[in-house]
């Protein structure tokens, strides 16, 4: 039992490591976009179901675009864009996708 606190510390450190964000670069990071969309759907006139549905649809679409190509992205793009998105504290797949597209444009084409 004397090792229990140390084990919990190691487990906690692993849970918050950058490697756990991308799950070994096989899957994109997981963001809870429901919270984001709920915040965006709360407008001056109250809750907008239409805004909520549009937000959810755009997040799902961006996630699917990211998921399809995630394993092919350079690790520095995966990590860099995830870190940039998390730094904004708005876990948003549309922003993550925009970052990925921007970073990929900066990579020079392979010589032929």
Q: What would you call each of these model-derived segments?
A:
Residues 1-6:
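Positively charged n-region of N-terminal signal peptides that target proteins for export
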Residues 7-16:
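Bacterial N-terminal signal peptides
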Residues 19-112:
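Mitochondrial intermembrane space
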